[in-house]
């Protein structure tokens, strides 16, 4: 009599629709979870890198200290058995001596791959010296002279370290130039007339490789961002790349006499620049005359003298000494090397012109507006206007 009834009749596709909704909901949840998980991983990586970078900054002296102490100790204990370690500490490839026009024999050294070990060791040593001098000697000096803010202290220490290094290497470079025939006072003829310079005296080789070690160390500082990037960070990066390239090519292909002159022009001008900037941080009364001397030295060395060297590459490079490519005789003074040398030096000169513009603008501000500020550097918000 009575028909069976149901509270709800099954509709075709209802179960599938519900399953689809549930699947979509689950997928959306999984996507949200996946996005959150990715964001969490990114934040964790950033925190991890920040921690690692902090550890590197705080302990950047550890590896240089270890290498600087261990290698000389091993070599001192067993100098014969530790000939391998001797390549890191002493000059390699000695091959006789010369007495031509000299009171006593002077050792001569060839070039080879072990010279890279020497550069690597002294780059580490300079890295350690930089850390020690800045933290133990220059920071107390900054505090004693009321350089209060951390930004100014860091810049002051960086510039003073640079001044200390070039105060040693500048005169040493002049000594090397003085004792190298035909180079004194930036004579360009002597750069080419005795080419190729396959063997070097101990002073020249040590000077050249130590300078290479310094620029390797400076490049590491730049890559690890151990110094706060300046506004001219890009120009500085290009400068370091060009410098390392010039050092490597000039050493390998026997153009070291050109390299000596280029070293000196940049070292002495950098000495004046770093000294004037350091006096600026100290608000010293000599900062204005020091900066004026810096501009004069910069124009004479990095422009007048460098332009003379550039001109000699276009003229004397071809006419003085041999001009041919002979791989067996290690004779590389040819049209290709002339083009490469001029291109690299011209690029370096372009960077120097950019920095000269900054110097002249700073000179105008200092002399006429009484503002002692280097506009190449980033200034901390806590620093006053007269900071770097």
Swiss-Prot record:
Protein keywords: Endoplasmic reticulum, Glycoprotein, Membrane, Transferase, Transmembrane, Transmembrane helix
Family: Belongs to the sphingosine N-acyltransferase family.
Higher taxonomy: Eukaryota, Fungi, Dikarya, Ascomycota, Pezizomycotina
Spans traversing the lipid bilayer: 60-80, 113-133, 166-186, 204-224, 241-261, 339-359
Name recorded for this polypeptide: Sphingosine N-acyltransferase-like protein FUM17
Result of knocking out the encoding gene: Does not affect the production of fumonisins B1, B2 and B3. Double knockout of FUM17 and FUM18 does not reduce resistance to FB1.
Main location: endoplasmic reticulum
Compartments, as annotated in UniProt: Endoplasmic reticulum membrane
GO cellular-component term (any): membrane
Membrane topology field: Multi-pass membrane protein
């Amino acid at each position: 009599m009575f028909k069976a009834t149901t509270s709800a009749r099954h509709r075709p596709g209802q179960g599938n629709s519900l399953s689809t909704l549930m699947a979509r909901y689950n997928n959306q949840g999984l996507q949200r979870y996946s996005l959150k998980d990715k964001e969490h991983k990114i934040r964790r990586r950033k925190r991890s890198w920040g921690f690692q970078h902090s550890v590197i900054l705080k302990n950047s002296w550890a590896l240089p200290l270890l290498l600087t102490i261990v290698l000389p100790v091993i070599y001192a204990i067993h100098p014969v058995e530790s000939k391998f370690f001797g390549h890191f500490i002493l000059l390699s490839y000695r091959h006789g001596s010369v007495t031509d026009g000299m009171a006593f024999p002077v050792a001569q050294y060839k070039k080879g791959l072990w010279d890279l070990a020497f550069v690597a060791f002294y780059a580490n040593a300079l890295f350690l010296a930089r850390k020690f001098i800045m933290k133990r000697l220059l920071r107390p000096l900054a505090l004693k002279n009321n350089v209060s803010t951390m930004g100014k202290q860091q810049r002051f220490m960086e510039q003073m370290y640079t001044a200390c290094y070039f105060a040693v290497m500048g005169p040493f470079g002049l000594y090397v130039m003085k004792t190298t025939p035909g180079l004194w006072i930036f004579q360009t003829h002597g750069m080419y007339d005795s080419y190729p310079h396959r063997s070097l005296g101990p002073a020249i080789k040590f000077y050249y490789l130590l300078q290479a070690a310094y620029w390797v160390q400076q490049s590491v500082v730049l890559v690890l961002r151990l110094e706060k990037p300046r506004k001219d960070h890009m120009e500085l990066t290009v400068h370091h790349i060009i410098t390392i390239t010039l050092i490597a090519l000039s050493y390998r292909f026997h153009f070291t006499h050109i390299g000596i002159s280029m070293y000196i022009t940049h070292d002495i001008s950098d000495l004046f620049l770093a000294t004037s900037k350091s006096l600026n941080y100290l608000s010293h009364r000599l900062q204005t005359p020091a900066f004026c001397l810096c501009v004069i030295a910069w124009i004479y060395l990095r422009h007048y003298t460098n332009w003379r060297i550039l001109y000699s590459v276009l003229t004397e490079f071809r006419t003085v000494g041999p001009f041919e490519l002979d791989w067996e005789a290690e004779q590389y003074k040819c049209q290709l090397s002339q083009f490469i040398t001029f291109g690299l030096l011209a690029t370096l000169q372009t960077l120097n012109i950019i920095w000269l513009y900054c110097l002249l603008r700073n000179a105008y501000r200092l002399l006429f507006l009484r503002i002692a500020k280097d506009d190449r550097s980033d200034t901390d918000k806590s620093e006053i206007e007269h900071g770097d």
